[in-house]
Amino acid sequence: MKGKRSEAITQGFERAPHRALLMGTGIPRKELGKPLIGIATSFTDLIPGHIGMRDLERFIEKGVHTGGGYSFLFGIPGVCDGIAMGHKGMHYSLSTRELIADMVESIAEAHRLDGLVLLTNCDKITPGMLMAAARLDIPCIVVTAGPMLTGTGRGGRRYSFVTDTFEAMARYKAGEINAAELQQCEDRACPGAGSCQGLFTANTMAILTETLGMSLVGCGTALAVSSLKRQIAFASGERIVSLVREGITPRQILTREAFENAIRVDLALGGSSNTVLHLLSIAHEAEVDLPLDLFDKLSRETPQLASMNPGGKHFMEDLDAAGGVPGVLYQLRDQIHDNPTLNGVGVKQIIDSVIDVDETVIHPKEDAVRPEGGIAILTGNLTPDGAVVKQSGVSEKMMTFEGTARCFNSEEEAMQALMGGQVKAGDVVVIRYEGPKGGPGMREMLAPTATLMGLGLGDSVALITDGRFSGGTRGPCVGHVSPEAAVGGPIALVEDGDTIVLDIPSRRLEVKVSDQELAKRRERWQAPEPKIKKGWLSRYASVVTSANTGAVCKAR
């Protein structure tokens, strides 16, 4: 091991003040020569995905000390997208990804930590942590806190967050369930600690973190309440000290091949469309070229092998029992690169260690759920720079659709129309000025999409937006439309009554309006006033880039 970063604060007579401050925290002098490990914890008792982290912190600390290091905890904020959904709070969710990356960078650099254990779980926290790891390029290992168990009900019914709350709300509005049944859904949907039970954004990112090689084998699917999760936390603490001594850093792991592996696993499972944004942003920090169209190229080659909630019947506990990430890699083995991982072995060795895969959950290729992957990238005159659709959540009937535009300039306007019965079969709901700059913050449209499904319109109405969707979204919903409305993208020029064509097999999203007419509308179009003119979101809107490049922040 070459000279440690922490020697800048622990060695030499001129560092006497630094040592005094460190010993003021309780660290004995004899420990100052050990690798100093930061545990970036996003613990909060405000959200269920993170309430179990106090226990995991202890096991990580034990592992660090067993491995011969000395650990320090520092806090990182965490936002629950479910709680932030459908109101002003959702403006802040995506933007916290950048704050998290900046905060981890700031603490690690200011205190010259030798390595980091990144304790995370929910939607934007995991990509923010990975962005920081790639940017810093110091030894790092990620521990995701794990998924929640499904709720239980009579007759073996299994409850989960999205389908039994957001969609239940719309069913209640439609008179399909009564108030007592709605309350029962509320009571049973979230039985304890962990990220939401389906293949939503948090769990997809945990799986991709393991696939990338940035967490230990099994971490991506090990349940929050399991003893295995604690064992992984301990092993991760022990492993980070070895990574420091071996000089293994994230950019040695986060190669182009690692990202291709992650995309293929994402596609095979039908994961959240948000992963497109996040993988692009992590690759940006790792200085890896990852074009948007690569997702579509790989999707055409990679079959969907699992039917995961929200679009299917299986939950994270099923995937974990079926073989987890190694099981998926095994079924894709002829398409997977042998990339290094933080486990000390390559991906192929992990695949070779697989003993058994439950093929009723993780199908073999010859019995694929769909011939293509879960995500498709669309282009056309409505989205010249690309848009994203989670095709794994779209019914065969809606893979091609032609409908009449109903335009709304905010999520709130769209929800008012949906709940007021103003959206009918054959419509295409257009929600715009919700992009990274225009939102600002590119809000998730889970409430509108869940309402469409709950109202029984999932097979007769499409929704397109320059915003994004929850990992819990299902149905014919196209997001990340780029360029966004706030910068004059074509979605800003669509008018009520226009005909919109959605053709997922052909990867097209178009409005049936001539170029000449669009040019006339562009001449009349005026950029709206910013919705938020002060504070963090105002600054964020001024530096955030388009969704097709990951909505990363760049200097003015």
Swiss-Prot record:
GO cellular component labels: cytosol
Active site: S470
Sequence positions that bind [2Fe-2S] cluster: C122, C196
Pfam family, one: ILV_EDD_C
Binding site for Mg(2+): D81, D123, K124, E444
SUPFAM superfamilies named among the record's database cross-references: IlvD/EDD N-terminal domain-like, LeuD/IlvD-like
Entry-linked PROSITE patterns: ILVD_EDD_1, ILVD_EDD_2
Keywords, alphabetical: 2Fe-2S, Amino-acid biosynthesis, Branched-chain amino acid biosynthesis, Iron, Iron-sulfur, Lyase, Magnesium, Metal-binding
Matching InterPro entries: Dihydro-acid_dehy_C, DihydroxyA_deHydtase, DiOHA_6PGluconate_deHydtase_CS, ILV_EDD_C, ILV_EDD_N, IlvD/EDD_N
GO BP field: isoleucine biosynthetic process; L-valine biosynthetic process
Entry's EC annotation: 4.2.1.9
Pathway info: Amino-acid biosynthesis; L-isoleucine biosynthesis; L-isoleucine from 2-oxobutanoate: step 3/4; Amino-acid biosynthesis; L-valine biosynthesis; L-valine from pyruvate: step 3/4
Catalytic class of the enzyme: lyase
Modification N6-carboxylysine, positions: K124
Subunit structure: Homodimer.
Similarity remark: Belongs to the IlvD/Edd family.
Cited function: Functions in the biosynthesis of branched-chain amino acids. Catalyzes the dehydration of (2R,3R)-2,3-dihydroxy-3-methylpentanoate (2,3-dihydroxy-3-methylvalerate) into 2-oxo-3-methylpentanoate (2-oxo-3-methylvalerate) and of (2R)-2,3-dihydroxy-3-methylbutanoate (2,3-dihydroxyisovalerate) into 2-oxo-3-methylbutanoate (2-oxoisovalerate), the penultimate precursor to L-isoleucine and L-valine, respectively.
Protein name as annotated: Dihydroxy-acid dehydratase
Organism: Syntrophotalea carbinolica (strain DSM 2380 / NBRC 103641 / GraBd1) (Pelobacter carbinolicus)
Taxonomic lineage from the root: Bacteria, Pseudomonadati, Thermodesulfobacteriota, Desulfuromonadia, Desulfuromonadales
Gene name of the record: ilvD
